[in-house]
Amino acid sequence: MRQIERDMNRAIRYRQNMSKQNTSVRCYREEIEVRLHGNLIGTVDTASNQLRIFDGGWQTVTTKSRLNALMDEFAPCMGVFQKNWEWFVSDRLTGQVVPFVSGMTV
């Protein structure tokens, strides 16, 4: 995990706003938003700790890396990967793989 991703997760954990390089975290009363280059890529519901993931319109290596860092923190058994130019989400516990859908809850 990259340093910026550790900083991102720390900011979310402690509910602190953060803006570093191309990644920002904004904390609101009931939700925390994560943005990459200004595009929404993740939200954490502070009441339920549910994580919603988005591609922000860009299915890049960096977006995937940030999403996997978020999932390491908030959905540890889940991960995003790419096969034949398509994104998928896998559950490492069950082995289930589903197509990635922007806005899905993991």
What are these regions (language model features)?
Residues 1-106:
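Terminal leader/tail segments of proteins
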